[in-house]
Amino acid sequence: MVFWTELTNQLNRVTLNFPDEREKEYRDFYFVRSYKTTRVAYLILALLYAFFGYLDSVVARQYFDLFIIIRVIVVITLLFVFFYSYLNKFRINWQTLIFITYFLGAVGIILMLVMLPEVVVYSSGLILVFLAGSVLIKLRFLAFSIASWLVIVIYVIAGILWKVDYSIVLSNVFFFAGAIIIGMIAAYRTEVFNRDNFNLYLQIAKKNVQIEQANKNLEDKVEERTKLLNFRNKELKEEVKRRALIEKELITA
């Protein structure tokens, strides 16, 4: 798998930003290509986050009320982003909203995980959140990376505060870190690929403009030559008429 191409050597290796005005153009391009996917993803994730509440009733009966409150808060936030995506303002702060809701969804699972550290389903749930953040909701690479590692830090702090067994915290951190690294690779490659396509799109658009300009210039030249030929043809006809008239006058004389 190629992570860096000759076409994208000019990108910042960490942020993946273009060094010039193309960055703003790319962000507009990326939004137009992504917002519908993000909208559908948030609806699906809201349903899934709510549906897993049934699992709480099975494995976390003693904390069921609290876990449901957590899920309701997260689901309402996800649905807010879903409906907000229909407004024009969504274009301005959509990545910020995605970052916040992704982080909030992960923290919600962390609270459940530290209260029931022996129940492995919640650690699996957090890995699902990492998966959604890296490939589904269209969060950019740098934002995904920052949010995900912050989640790990919060999990470790929460584990200490809730006095979770050290071995459980350590083993979970290893699995979470592995999931994040895999997600970072996927997010990095996806963003490089998208920026590659955008760069290619700009080059094709530039070539099309050049071709259109060349065609216009050719049309102008053809039109100019056509006018010249018509003018010469008119002159020739007038010359023929003039000579015919002179010849007729000579014959008459």
Q: What is the role of each PLM region?
A:
Residues 41-133, 150-156:
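Hydrophobic transmembrane alpha-helices and their membrane-interface boundaries in multi-pass
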Residues 87-93, 116-121, 143-148, 152, ...:
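Transmembrane alpha-helices and their extracellular/periplasmic helix-loop junctions
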Residues 192, 199-253:
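Amphipathic alpha-helical coiled-coil "transmission" helices that mediate dimerization
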